[in-house]
Structure formats: C-alpha cells, structure tokens
C-alpha cells in the first residue's frame, strides 16, 4: 500500500511539473514577428495573439539584391484553422516603398472588406472584417520597419 501511495505521489508531482512547464512556455510566446533583413531568406515565427491563441508568421524573401535591405518580401500571417492573410512588400533603403497583392483564405467563416494600405514609409496595414457565424471582428496584419527589421503582428 505504501508503494502505491508513493508511486501515486510521484505521478502527481510529475504531472504538476509538466503542466507548469507547458503553461510557462505558452506565456513566453511573442506577440510580434521580427524579420531580420540582413539575414534574409525565409523566416518563420510562432506567436500568441491577444486571446492566447497560437499563430504563425512566415516572411519570405522574393528577390535577392546586392544591397542589404532592398528587395521584395512575402508576409503571411496564419491563424491555424481559422484564416491566413498577407501581402507583398517592396523595401528600399530600410523603408517600405510599396505594398501590393494582398491575399487571404479562410478555413471557417469569411473575410469581408479587405483593404491594404501603406500608412507611411515604415508601416503597412492589411485590414479586414472576419465573420464567423453570429460574431465578427475587425482584424488584419500590420508590418512595420524598425531599422533593418520588418516587424509583423496581428492588427
């Protein structure tokens, strides 16, 4: 009987440790992706949105130029099982020269009123209304230049 109690106690302690580790790692996820233009290539990020849902951002370099911080990049933001949205940006001299070809797809619900805007030479916003069943909310993707980094987050 003592052996059974000890093994149960050990099992409970192990489960508590595992659950604590899982909750700590979930709270440590960033809320925005920081793409390093100097590194280039394709960079993938796992984020956590304001509601605690895990999301994914993929930023992919489209062209390679001799000068650092020049080029075209595909920005893709995924809410797994819900929606994916993004756009392309052209960067020149660490500034956003243009934003073009917005795209989106949905697993459930629908996206209404999509709008891609270059707010300034350092910021682009792709806004839309996401509608699912009886609920809807305004959301989207924001990309901003910060030095030689392209910072992406959910609107």
Language-model regions, residue ranges each:
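N-terminal prepro-regions of secreted/extracellular proteins
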Residues: 1-76
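Mature secreted bioactive peptide module from preproproteins
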Residues: 61-155
């Amino acid at each position: 009987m003592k052996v059974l109690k000890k093994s149960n106690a050990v099992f409970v302690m192990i489960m508590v440790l595992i659950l604590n580790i899982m909750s700590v790692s979930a709270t440590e996820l960033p809320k925005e992706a920081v793409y390093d233009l100097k590194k280039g290539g394709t960079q993938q990020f796992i984020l956590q949105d304001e509601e605690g849902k895990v999301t994914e951002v993929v930023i992919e370099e489209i062209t390679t130029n001799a000068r650092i911080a020049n080029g075209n990049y595909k920005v893709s933001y995924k809410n797994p099982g819900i929606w994916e949205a993004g756009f392309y940006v052209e960067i020149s001299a660490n500034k956003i020269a243009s934003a073009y070809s917005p795209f989106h797809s949905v697993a459930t619900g629908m996206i209404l009123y999509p709008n891609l805007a270059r707010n300034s030479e350092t910021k682009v916003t792709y806004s839309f209304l996401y509608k699912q069943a009886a609920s809807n909310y305004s959301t989207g993707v924001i990309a901003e230049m910060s030095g030689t980094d392209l910072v992406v987050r959910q609107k």
